[in-house]
Amino acid sequence: MTRLCTMAVTGGVAAALVAHAAAQPLPALETVLGRAGAYVLGLQQQLAGIVAEEDYVQDVRASSVLGPTTRSGLPGVRHRELKSDLLLVRPVGADRWVQFRDVFEVDGRPVRDRNQRLMKLFVTPSSATANQAEQIANESSRYNIGNLLRTVNLPVLALAILEPRQQSRFVFKRIGKGGDAPVRSAAAAATTVWVIGYREVEGQTMIRTTNFRDMPARGRFWIEPDSGQVLASELIAQDLSLTGVITVGYEREPALNVMVPIQMKERYDLRRGPSPVTGEANYRSFRQFQVKVDEKIAPIVKE
């Protein structure tokens, strides 16, 4: 009888604690976005010292590769497998980080001119910072296939939306709680996670076509509200002729104790004609890297 009574009392205390916790107000959306912004700035600094190995598969339906040559200059390529090192760099004098894909194997063959390309990019960079950033983006997309020029297939791209200086360009709204993210991320399924939708509302959009037409971005983030950690992202860029969707999942890397992208999926649909271009990248072998700098090398700036 005593034991039953103790259990009953303990259960009553637990129920009271649960009720008290439930009564605590949820943080405001602005508070969570502020935490997410601070988290993204910190994550950029952490990822700047880390290299990941990327296994990247791209596929194009037959109707998508007829006509002009692909981005790589090879006509009619329908399937591509890339192995790359992925790292975050900061061009000299720039105020933003740029992700660089250093491809070392294409369809099972080593890249022959890899050293020369890196020499041109980092040892003898352009004197114009913006031009150097553009060179990095173009080099990172060098082996993409399909009749679609794109430099947006980089896993941390969507995180820029949450940077404090960028948030005013977007409208945000909480649209649900954790559930199945469209990409691999076990943490994003937790019920405590917020799903926050966003929509770009200002001109001169973050993503633009090669003809400088705006492509307003929209999508969702899976965010842990107390810490601001981003567990998954969805980025949709769209205009009258094209829709691109890029999803990324994040998990903590135990050896480095930092959240890292573990998977990226992408799909591009053209309004007229071609079937979709799709891709899936998985990330592994995360490791610290060291850069030797002399007076001739454009330094990777760390703050």
Give the location of each predicted region.
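Residue-level detector of alpha-helix boundaries and kinks
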Residues: 8, 21-22
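Bacterial N-terminal signal peptides that target proteins for export
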Residues: 1-12
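N-terminal signal peptide c-region/cleavage motif recognized by signal peptidases
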Residues: 16-18
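Structured extracytoplasmic
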Residues: 23-218, 225-231, 238-245, 252-261, ...
